[in-house]
């Protein structure tokens, strides 16, 4: 039986990793062993970053809603409680967008929330 040398598969595997390592500096781009470690670490950072992005945006929306609510005389928690009691089903992303791009609309929402809290 002939010996299997796996040269083609190895070349393909190396090429794939080295192409993923494009843009890296020095050995991280040129040397397969180092490039493989760099690519794996980069993929870990990318995975973690995708999770962190969701957290960061949610906290940004909360900050924006809180700022707009305080302009209208409510704290964030009281505003959200009032919105919930009104039965308004806007999520934080939508509320933050309204707060930034339509202050008059947000003021109307804040007034509704205030009226529900007073009742």
From Swiss-Prot:
GO terms for molecular function: rRNA binding; structural constituent of ribosome. Signal peptide: none annotated. It comes from the Bacteria. Gene3D superfamilies: 6.10.160.10, Ribosomal protein L20. SUPFAM superfamilies: Ribosomal protein L20. GO terms for cellular component: ribonucleoprotein complex; ribosome. Coiled coil: none annotated. Keywords: Ribonucleoprotein, Ribosomal protein, RNA-binding, rRNA-binding. One of its GO terms (biological process) is translation. PROSITE patterns: RIBOSOMAL_L20 (PS00937). NCBIfam families: rplT_bact. Binds directly to 23S ribosomal RNA and is necessary for the in vitro assembly process of the 50S ribosomal subunit. It is not involved in the protein synthesizing functions of that subunit. HAMAP family: Ribosomal_bL20. Belongs to the bacterial ribosomal protein bL20 family. This is Large ribosomal subunit protein bL20. It comes from Xylella fastidiosa (strain M12). The lineage of its organism: Bacteria, Pseudomonadati, Pseudomonadota, Gammaproteobacteria, Lysobacterales.
């Amino acid at each position: 039986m002939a010996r299997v040398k796996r040269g083609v598969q190895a070349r393909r595997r190396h090429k794939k990793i080295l192409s993923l390592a494009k843009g890296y500096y020095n050995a991280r781009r040129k040397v397969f062993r180092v490039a493989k470690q760099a690519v794996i670490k980069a993929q870990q950072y990318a995975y973690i970053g995708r999770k962190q992005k969701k957290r960061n945006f949610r906290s940004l929306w909360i900050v924006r809603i809180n700022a707009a609510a305080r302009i209208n005389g409510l704290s964030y928690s009281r505003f959200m409680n009032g919105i919930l009691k009104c039965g308004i089903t806007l999520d934080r992303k939508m509320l933050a967008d309204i707060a930034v791009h339509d202050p008059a609309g947000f003021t109307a929402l804040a007034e509704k929330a205030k009226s529900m809290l007073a009742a």
